Design a protein with these regions (language model features):
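Lipolytic serine-hydrolase domain surface
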Residues: 25, 29-118, 122-132, 151-155, ...
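Short substrate-entry loop that stabilizes the transition state in hydrolases
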Residues: 145-150
């Protein structure tokens, strides 16, 4: 595996999710380096705001705040489903150079305008009634991501992948605080049962072998462990899921190897996106004492 330093989290996520949709046919498991990063498409030249809606599942507490930005907090809560509306305002000055740089440059600003909750029944009825065109995708964010930031990133990925109404954000109760790493670790493990439940609902709504998962950083632990739990109920040769993408995976590499044979029958393809220049993963290795899966 060749090493490619200098990629940001945002660049890694866009690269991995683009690979996910572009390579949805059956094949062997893959490992990709930063050399495979595609250019980020920039289509808008107008400075007029663009509004996008992202469906979400969250386990966060409701704060009672009056603004969309503090609608959900960083504590554990009940399952809530709905849509977060994001407004993206392009910055014309940056757009001509954004797709020419070897690293990620935002070509606009994103604002969480509103949060609309819907019932669980209504939420899952809508995707089931839509024609199957693209692979549905569940995105699990990583450590230090609040609800607003998670919605903004999800809107960016949904736009780049052209997955309107097919992209689903799972927002577990990360604290959005750099110093609360161990708190986030507890919360991602607490969330595993709910991640498993959400994957099962997606399979029910879209069909077996159609669902893709992209998980980032600490979110990879939730994705992997949810699949381990699902393996107990899996029978037959057909995979339950289409593609699992693990980006900058903050999970013990040795533990992942132990689980790989367990989760492999459930997923048609597994892709790792790795880096040798990820400061967060280097710090995680120091804290835990063992290499992380997302490091080369």
């Amino acid at each position: 595996m060749r090493r490619q330093p200098g990629f940001s989290y945002a660049g890694l996520m866009v690269a991995a999710t683009c690979l996910l949709i572009a390579a949805c046919s059956p094949g062997d498991d893959e490992q990709l380096t930063g050399e495979d990063q595609p250019a980020i498409p920039v289509e808008t030249v107008s400075a007029e705001p663009i509004r996008r809606s992202v469906p979400f599942i969250t386990l966060r507490n409701k704060t009672g705040g009056s603004s969309a930005s503090d609608y959900f907090g960083g504590e554990r809560g009940e399952i809530h489903t709905g849509y977060c509306d994001i407004t993206w305002t392009p910055i014309p000055l940056l757009e001509p150079i954004a797709d020419r740089m070897p690293f990620y440059i935002p070509s606009g600003t994103m604002t969480l305008e509103s949060v609309i909750e819907v019932s669980d029944t209504e939420f899952w009825r809508k995707p089931a009634n839509k024609p199957v065109v693209d692979q549905p995708l569940l995105y699990l964010h990583g450590y230090n991501i609040g609800f607003e930031k998670g919605c903004s990133r999800a809107a960016l990925f949904q736009e780049n992948l052209r997955l309107a109404s097919r992209f689903l954000l799972f927002s577990w109760p990360s604290d959005d605080t750099v110093t609360n790493y161990t708190h986030d670790e507890s919360d991602i493990y607490w969330s595993i049962a709910y991640i498993k439940h959400s994957l099962e609902r997606m399979i029910e709504a879209f069909g077996e072998g159609r669902v893709d998962i992209v998980s980032h950083s600490m979110g990879t632990r939730g994705a992997v462990m949810a699949l381990v739990r699902m393996s107990d109920q899996h029978s037959g040769d057909a995979p339950l899921l289409n593609h699992l993408v693990l980006v900058a995976a903050d999970i013990d590499a040795g533990i992942f190897r132990q689980y790989l044979d367990i989760i492999r029958p459930l997923v048609r393809r597994i892709t790792l996106y790795v880096s040798d220049n990820d400061n967060a993963l280097s710090l995680s290795e120091e804290v835990h004492g063992y290499p992380r899966l997302g490091m080369t």
